[in-house]
Amino acid sequence: MKTQKRETNPIVTAIESIAEPLCIAEGFELVHVECVSDQGGMIVRIYLDKPGGITLDDCVHMTRHLGDIIDVELEEISAYRLEISSPGAKRPLKKLADFERFLGSRVKVEAVEPIGGRLKFTGILSKVQDGCVEVVVNNEPVVFHFEQISKSRLA
């Protein structure tokens, strides 16, 4: 499955490698992980999804499980706060499967290099085929090779 360039933050990469197998085993999709500096420590945000969406009980359950694993596996993270939530209405699109799932939706796409003099595009996700994503912007189709996309999300 093709995914966009992964996070280069080694802590995020480590958390992703720990969280992904547990999420799959528990029936969740790991959508995104981010770490943000905070007074006296760090906030670790993990965004999860599943068919039908996640509930507050799901968030509590995964916070307990992931928190325990992170505490044991990543001792270098001493002071952190773990937040588990849904990706929400502006969900990031990171895999080709995400684009396929949200065909017909309004999206924002940022290209690695300018296309027609632009980097940022907002339009309707109209096609995913042969490793390419098509977005209709102002009634004009714009085709991105998946590797050309630096960021994308639902709009």
Swiss-Prot record:
| Coarse class of the protein's main subcellular location | cytoplasm
- Disulfide bridges in this chain: none
Which UniProt keywords are given for this protein, alphabetically ordered?
Answer: Cytoplasm, Ribosome biogenesis
Example GO BP = ribosomal small subunit assembly
Q: Which SUPFAM superfamilies match?
A: YhbC-like, C-terminal domain, YhbC-like, N-terminal domain
Q: Which InterPro entries match?
A: Ribosome_maturation_RimP (IPR003728), RimP_C (IPR028998), RimP_C_sf (IPR036847), RimP_N (IPR028989), RimP_N_sf (IPR035956)
Where is this protein found? Cytoplasm
Q: Determine if Cytoplasm is one of this entry's keywords.
A: yes
Domain of life (superkingdom): Bacteria
Q: What does this protein's UniProt record list under function?
A: Required for maturation of 30S ribosomal subunits.
- Recorded protein name is Ribosome maturation factor RimP
Organism of provenance: Desulforapulum autotrophicum (strain ATCC 43914 / DSM 3382 / VKM B-1955 / HRM2)
